[in-house]
Amino acid sequence: MQKNVTKKMVLTAMLACLAFVLNTFVYFPAMAPFQHCVDVIAAVLVGPWYGFAAALLCGIMRMLSGRTIQAVTGAIYGPILGGLIYKKTKNIYLVWIGEVIGTGFFGAVSSYPLMKMFYGLDAQSPFYYIPFYTPAAVVGATMGVAVLVILKKTSVLERMQKELA
């Protein structure tokens, strides 16, 4: 049991660092699709809570490198919702829906009060950030599902999940 927890913790840290590096060097203005790609992969491999931890760690690192608090709020809900859906259904494609809804709606809406409180930005509506978060979540979640489908077809996903179980 302790060995598997250690493996999950190490993989969580590796996924957080992978997301940070990809988002730092492959940059699209106001978009972080690789965060959502890694969120989907984390939700399937390590589950919702370790996926949340990976997203939180990456978000904190991104904030320390000059991003806003949106680096955290835009990342943490997707792996939780996607991971819970995967835990219940074992369907990789439904993780996509969890990531897009978790980030595109919950992440966007939760950003509004924090941006207002910490940065003084009053966007007039809690739904203001949805059109900015959703495209990044769609693109990133699609990449994550594509990676998982390839891993599944080559039986690597099954071996990784057995190793972490």
Range-by-range predicted roles:
Residues 1-165:
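Loop-helix junctions at membrane interfaces
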